[in-house]
From Swiss-Prot:
GO BP annotation list: hydrogen peroxide catabolic process; indole alkaloid biosynthetic process; response to hydrogen peroxide
Regions of compositional bias (Polar residues) in chain numbering: 1-13
An annotated Gene Ontology molecular function: heme binding
Matches recorded under SMART domains: Catalase (SM01060)
Protein's name in the database: Catalase easC
Domain of life: Eukaryota
Functional summary from the UniProt entry: Catalase; part of the gene cluster that mediates the biosynthesis of fungal ergot alkaloid. DmaW catalyzes the first step of ergot alkaloid biosynthesis by condensing dimethylallyl diphosphate (DMAP) and tryptophan to form 4-dimethylallyl-L-tryptophan. The second step is catalyzed by the methyltransferase easF that methylates 4-dimethylallyl-L-tryptophan in the presence of S-adenosyl-L-methionine, resulting in the formation of 4-dimethylallyl-L-abrine.
Cofactors: heme
Gene assigned in the entry: easC
Active site (record annotation): H53
Amino acid sequence: MASQVSLTAQGSGLSAPLNGPEHLTSTTVENDPRLLDILSRFNREKIPERAVHARGAGAYGEFEVTHDVSDICDIDMLLGIGKKTPCAVRFSTTALERGSAESVRDVKGMAIKLFTGDGEWDWVCLNIPMFFIRDPSKFPDLVHAQRPDPATNLANPAAWWEFVCNNHESLHMAVFLFTDFGTMFDYRSMSGYVSHAYKWVMPDGTWKYVHWFLASDQGPNFEQGNQTREAAPNDSESATRDLYQSLERGECPSWTVKVQVIDPEDAPRLAFNILDVSKHWNLGNYPPDIPVIPERCVGKLTLKKGPENYFEEIEKLAFSPSHLVHGVEPSEDPMLQARLFAYPDAQEHRLGPQFSDMAAKRTGHAANDAPKTKKPAVPLQKQSREHAEWVSQVTSSSWSQPNETDYKFPRELWAALPRLRGEEFQNRLVVNMAESVSQIPEDLRQKVYKTLALVAEDLASRVESLTEEMVVPEQRPRL
């Protein structure tokens, strides 16, 4: 009987008859359990990509305490100058898919997993110190507005601008995003902000509201961002390549970790609500009439090496704002409260129910995964009635409605740009906005101009003038 040799995926031969009715119901696959195993593993080797922050790059490093902060925290990792903690960091784009270009105008993510003696502590940061919304129920609409058109799968700036025009709290971050910070870009030069207020709790139950951030010691690198955008059609991986090549050269990027602190009794007296993540904690840049919340240095985070297997070591990491350690509590910020549920739920969908046990084992930090001794939780000291009434704002019907600070913060940002970065920096904001708005229908363009006028008349007029010059003839209204 004539026969041929079939090869499995591993190159092993298997004789298979070419003819004979008795063999019609018996296949090579059925006779080779190893091939069944190979194919089944291949079918399952990919996992669902993240709903946001799908495209990423990562590295390993360590955090070192450089300043004494024992007067404001009881966090073991931060107590003791010179104390070092290993960490894994994942950088990412935000809105687009895993295969998208890194150079697109987009918010960037910086997630840090610290392997402390008390367990994993995650810092889930963005490179912009505020967020688009304060009402978590709007989050799915926000993400959908940044996705490709569901009919054509093409970029859809109209959906994005429609969202901004209908949700004015997003104007602050929108103005920031259309500066060169939106494309300033390599991962080493961007800073990271946790954005939300957290609580640092002392042993006696007293506590402070805090916001911490990582200031890049390399950046910002606007020139690199402009070069990256120009090269985007030919190089969609420039930021990842820059990170890994710098580590191979022994150039270890670092970030200075700083914290801002507010007493809970002082929070209601500020001119904005620190539980509103669409606003930033003023460092002295803007607005000029809102109190400065000083920064304090905490430590230094330094990256040392890249992963040996990105998929296993970085892509399968599960970050969440709910991964906290003793001495840290979440604030009442509604967006943060929603993320405490949404992140673990998304990770379970992506990685399976055992995702929380994987990170330390994969990254080689299993020894630090479980606390050796667990400190008892400390009851938080109760605050005044004034503070309680202030906190109740986040559950009021007016919380998701526009208020004057939604226009004040972007207005002050727009006005401060020439002072902070120069007039040309402000001019490029106008150009960047016009390039985007020129791609949307005329009726929506008019809506955008009216919305921008709520921020600043000169911003609106300058964007309108340049946009209408850019509009292609087919988009102009016919007479």
